[in-house]
């Protein structure tokens, strides 16, 4: 019996070492853009749009699972596969749009963290941006020690945001029957609700983390068989995306309980949400909101920088030091802040830019993971392909609606 026990223990540890990449990807689903969208939806419509969060999160689970599977089975990430299959001019065009999307997303995330520091410390937005730059640089330096230290830090920040919103729910005391009804039964009260529902979904499927997740799992050939790695990855995605989904649900439920129920139905900006929370739920709740915004902004801007590195290396086989990429990508944020532009409008604009890249990441992902010649026995099941096509059509349609409505 002893030999069997001895081999079972390392096998269990082996699987545990594969957990982590999905936690990095999940950060993209709780960035400051999600904060702004969920708070606006909850304050305006109460619990009625919670079902959108539930379905959007289920879609995101499938998308991230397919991305991780592509890296595990083929040993190449999504950007590399696109590079291998398209002519050079198309590859360069793909790279440019992916970089623009990564930078636009990073802009909103960086500004979100700066807003959090401003609210918590009473500093100017420019000073908050400076603090954000120093902290994110420090976290990115962990990459020199390998992927695991970064996974621990980013995963820890994800868990902190989740814990903060558990406490926020306790403070706000949402009406449980209304919460369950909103989460389980779809409904769109009016055209404004359709617009916000499109915004919630548009802020959920993130093209930059689709590219990134396939890269985070591509170098795991020495960590077990393909079936073992796929199984562990499904668990990894399920845990990480469930946490991210809970955070989004909690954001909207807190806004519904704290703002909508008290008659504050026009809370759309992060600063006004913080200021409104103080008299309604107390300073502790407002401080937790600020801390969770900082944790979300810092972790998501780190992930955005990593995603930018992946798309550059994958599409054009070129890399630059992470500290230099961080300096380049944060420059637009400092320009926006110095110009005094509205931060919430910048968050919304980032979602518009993001919508252009969703189809360009999802469609090749679905084609590649459904390719028998490439994936062999691990190709997508026909049902998975059908669901994937439905998700692509839905995401593209709703994001097109969102884009047209904003113009």
Swiss-Prot record:
Keyword Transmembrane among UniProt keywords: yes
Transmembrane feature ranges: 16-36, 43-63, 95-115, 119-139, 152-172, 193-213, 239-259, 288-308, 318-338, 346-366, 387-407
Keywords: Cell inner membrane, Cell membrane, Ion transport, Membrane, Symport, Transmembrane, Transmembrane helix, Transport
Entry keyword annotation includes Lipid metabolism: no
Predominant location: membrane
Function of the molecule: H(+)-stimulated, divalent metal cation uptake system.
Family classification: Belongs to the NRAMP family.
Name of the protein in question: Divalent metal cation transporter MntH
Organism: Aeromonas hydrophila subsp. hydrophila (strain ATCC 7966 / DSM 30187 / BCRC 13018 / CCUG 14551 / JCM 1027 / KCTC 2358 / NCIMB 9240 / NCTC 8049)
Lineage, uppermost ranks: Bacteria, Pseudomonadati, Pseudomonadota, Gammaproteobacteria, Aeromonadales
Gene: mntH
């Amino acid at each position: 019996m002893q030999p069997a026990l001895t081999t079972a223990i390392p096998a269990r540890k082996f699987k545990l070492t594969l957990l982590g990449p999905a936690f990095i990807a999940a950060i993209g689903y709780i960035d400051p853009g999600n904060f702004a969208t969920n708070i606006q939806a909850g304050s305006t419509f109460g619990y009625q749009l919670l079902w959108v969060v539930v379905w959007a999160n289920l879609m995101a689970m499938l998308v991230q699972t397919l991305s991780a599977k592509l890296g595990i089975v083929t040993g190449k990430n999504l950007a590399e596969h696109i590079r291998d299959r398209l002519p050079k001019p198309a590859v360069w065009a793909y790279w440019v749009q992916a970089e623009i999307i990564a930078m636009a997303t990073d802009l909103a995330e960086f500004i979100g963290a700066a807003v959090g520091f401003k609210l918590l410390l009473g500093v100017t937005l420019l000073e908050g941006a400076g603090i954000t730059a120093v902290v994110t640089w420090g976290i990115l330096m962990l990459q020199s020690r390998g992927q695991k230290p970064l996974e621990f830090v980013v995963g820890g920040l994800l868990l902190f945001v989740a814990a903060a919103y558990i406490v926020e729910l306790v403070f706000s005391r949402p009406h449980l029957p209304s919460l369950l009804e909103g989460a389980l039964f779809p409904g769109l009260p009016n055209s404004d609700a359709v617009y916000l529902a499109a915004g919630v979904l548009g802020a959920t499927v993130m093209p930059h983390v689709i590219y990134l997740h396939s890269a985070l799992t591509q170098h795991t050939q020495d960590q077990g068989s393909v079936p073992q790695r796929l199984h562990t990855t499904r668990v990894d995605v399920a845990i990480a995306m469930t946490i991210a989904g809970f955070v989004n649900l909690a954001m909207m439920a807190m806004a519904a309980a704290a703002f909508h129920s008290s008659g504050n139905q026009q809370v759309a900006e992060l600063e006004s949400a913080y200021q409104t929370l103080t008299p309604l739920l107390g300073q502790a709740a407002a401080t937790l909101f600020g801390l969770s915004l900082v944790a979300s902004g810092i972790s998501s801007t780190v992930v955005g920088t990593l995603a930018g590195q992946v798309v550059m290396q994958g599409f054009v086989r070129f890399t630059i030091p992470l500290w230099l990429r961080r300096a380049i990508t944060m420059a637009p944020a400092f320009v926006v802040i110095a110009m005094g532009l509205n931060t919430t409008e910048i968050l919304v604009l980032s979602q518009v830019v993001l919508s252009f890249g969703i189809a360009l990441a999802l469609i090749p992902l679905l084609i590649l993971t459904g390719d028998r010649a490439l994936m062999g026995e691990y190709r997508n099941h026909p049902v998975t392909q059908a669901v994937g096509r439905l998700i692509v059509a839905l995401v593209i349609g709703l994001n097109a609606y969102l884009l047209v409505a904003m113009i």
